């Protein structure tokens, strides 16, 4: 899970909201072009074509707009640009796993850096809390569970990535899929190559 550095709200979205007084997100279905434009903008300008939750590469067709704070629980934030990111469409993890679940302990990737809370298990590919007790542990645990970040296929993909790259860590590119896993591997190179 990576930090999303939001840009200022794009002018096209500001103008759309001025022109159309929508009262909920479902009304955006009549304006699919703006939803697509928002996804394109976020993917290219803020997320480097990756889901911020699972870090898998996505594109406009394999993604959906995600409300960090669920629109059903926070109806006044349904078009707050800082509450919108683009997530993968996986049916078992990320935004679809989260649905309308909410906890004040959920790590908001726009407001907080998930790397302060999360780490990796190099043997299993699973995401783990960085701390073993306290508030940071609780935030990590809640977020991992809500997003199902240890979905079997996802953990296996991370494990295979670690195994496939453990002897070429010096050549990993920082962008693209699994960017925080790559940073973790670089920072823990000695322990990874000894496994």
Where are these regions (language model features)?
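C-terminal, charged low-complexity interaction regions
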Residues: 132-195
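Pocket-edge structural micro-motifs
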Residues: 88, 122, 131
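Residues that form generic nucleotide/phosphate-binding pockets
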Residues: 15-19, 37, 41, 87, ...
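Polybasic, low-complexity binding patches
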Residues: 74-82, 93-128
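Short, charged surface segments at domain edges that flank catalytic/cofactor-binding sites
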Residues: 2-50, 74-79
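Histidine-centered nuclease catalytic patch
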Residues: 53-86, 90-92, 96, 101
């Amino acid at each position: 899970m990576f930090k999303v550095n939001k840009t200022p709200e794009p002018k096209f979205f500001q103008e759309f909201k001025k022109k159309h007084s929508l009262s909920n997100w479902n009304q955006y279905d009549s304006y699919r072009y703006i939803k697509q434009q928002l996804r394109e903008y976020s993917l290219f300008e803020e997320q480097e074509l990756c889901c911020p939750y699972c870090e898998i590469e996505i594109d406009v067709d394999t993604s959906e707009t995600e409300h960090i704070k669920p629109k059903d629980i926070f109806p006044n934030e349904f078009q707050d640009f800082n509450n919108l990111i683009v997530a993968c469409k996986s049916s078992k993890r990320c935004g679809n796993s989260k649905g309308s679940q909410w906890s004040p302990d959920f790590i908001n990737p726009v407001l907080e850096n998930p790397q302060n809370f999360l780490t990796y298990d190099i043997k299993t590919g699973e995401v783990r809390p960085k701390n073993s007790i306290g508030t940071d542990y609780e935030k990590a645990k809640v977020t991992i569970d809500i997003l199902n970040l240890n979905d079997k296929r996802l953990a296996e993909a991370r494990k295979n990535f670690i195994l496939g790259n453990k002897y070429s860590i010096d050549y990993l590119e920082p962008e693209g899929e699994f960017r925080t896993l790559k940073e973790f591997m670089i920072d823990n190179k000695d322990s990874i190559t000894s496994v």
